[in-house]
From Swiss-Prot:
The gene is apt. It catalyses: AMP + diphosphate = 5-phospho-alpha-D-ribose 1-diphosphate + adenine. One of its GO terms (cellular component) is cytoplasm. Homodimer. Pathway: Purine metabolism; AMP biosynthesis via salvage pathway; AMP from adenine: step 1/1. One of its GO terms (biological process) is purine ribonucleoside salvage. Catalyzes a salvage reaction resulting in the formation of AMP, that is energically less costly than de novo synthesis. It is found in: Cytoplasm. Its main location: cytoplasm. This is Adenine phosphoribosyltransferase. Transmembrane segments: none annotated.
Length: 173
C-alpha cells in the first residue's frame, strides 16, 4: 500500500511557508491505519521489543496500537507537569527557546528493549530527548519507527547509531 496517497498536505499551516503533512487522513481510513500499524508491528517483532514509548500526542496514536497488537506495554512521554507520579525530565532546544519532556521514573526497567514511535521525524529534537529519557532509565533503544521522515530537515542526523524505519519519506518540502 502506498501510504503517501493517504497523507494530506496542508499548505501554509501552522504558519506561512510550511507544507504540513497531516496523518489524520491515514487514521480515518481503517485499511491505511491498519497497514501502517502492521508494518511497525513487524519491525518491532524483529527488534524483539519489550515495551513501546511515544511522545505526546501523535506518538501515542502510533505507539498504542503497536503495543496492543504485541500484547506489551506503552509508556507515554509528556510535557512537563502532565504526569502524576515521580518523573525524570530532559530539557532540549527548540528553534526559539526550550522544551521539557518527562516520563515516569518507573516506566522503563533496566535492560528493557524499547521501540520509540512517533508520527513524523522533522528535526529530531523530540525523539533525541525521548532517547535520553529511555536510556537514563536503563532502557535499550532497540528501534525507532515513524510514519513520515521529512528528509530535507535532516532529523536522521540526531539518530545516528540507532535502527530507524519510516514508512513514507519526503525528500523535498
Amino acid at each position: 500500500m502506498d501510504l503517501k496517497q493517504y497523507i494530506t498536505q496542508v499548505k501554509d499551516w501552522p504558519k506561512p511557508g510550511v507544507n504540513f503533512k497531516d496523518i489524520t487522513t491515514i487514521m480515518d481510513n481503517g485499511a491505511a491505519y491498519k497497514y501502517a500499524t502492521d508494518q511497525i508491528v513487524e519491525y518491532a517483532k524483529e527488534k524483539q521489543v519489550d515495551i513501546v514509548v511515544g511522545p505526546e500526542a501523535r506518538g501515542f496514536i502510533i505507539g498504542c496500537p503497536v503495543a496492543y497488537a504485541m500484547n506489551i506495554g506503552f509508556a507515554p512521554v509528556r510535557k512537563k507537569g502532565k504526569l502524576p507520579r515521580e518523573v525524570i525530565s530532559y530539557e532540549y532546544e527548540l528553534e526559539y527557546g526550550t522544551n521539557v519532556l518527562t516520563m515516569h521514573k518507573d516506566a522503563i526497567k533496566p535492560g528493557q528493549r524499547v521501540l520509540i514511535t512517533d508520527d513524523l521525524l522533522a528535526t529530531g529534537g523530540t525523539i533525541e530527548a525521548t532517547i535520553k529519557l529511555v536510556e537514563s532509565l536503563g532502557g535499550i533503544v532497540a528501534g525507532i519507527a515513524f510514519i513520515i521522515d521529512l528528509k530535507y530537515l535532516n532529523g536522521m542526523e540526531k539518530l545516528k547509531g540507532y535502527d530507524v524505519i519510516s514508512l513514507v519519506e519526503y525528500e523535498v518540502e
